[in-house]
């Protein structure tokens, strides 16, 4: 099931190419270089997948993603302090992932660029304006892979720093086990999807807006 999602960055070739089938999950990591900046986004998409374990793990990855997005930044907060927040819900059931939770983003240079990052050993303190990815995941050998990635940046408001989302893309609700999310996490997801719909509807036609409205509907 979804074997090509196992690596953190899969590259298609003639040997590993395969058709997508009902029941698969599809991981797409995308982005581009633009005059205003560099983008990086990952979504895991359900193709009518009903596997309870996959949904449970996806939801724990989402909980970690939300924990990073809502992390209360203090004066000396570094990526090493935040990294454990992203992993703790997976660790509760004995799971983890081998890559860092987030990387700095270059501009027409490297997509992965420091000095800051959200990782176990990064001690660089976050400052206003820094952009970093928020991408916890999970990869199970010979089975499947999951990742949710947004770009976020450090914003200052009344002497306090906090993370603000730059990425506007729906998170697949079909893969969520709502019983694992608490009320605060559900509220975060609903508020995020409201922003996604508001920001994207203006560049879409009627059919696309209808699909977007469903993807961004409240849970």
PLM feature segments, named:
Residues 1-219:
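Active-site neighborhoods and metal-handling regions in enzymes and metal-associated proteins
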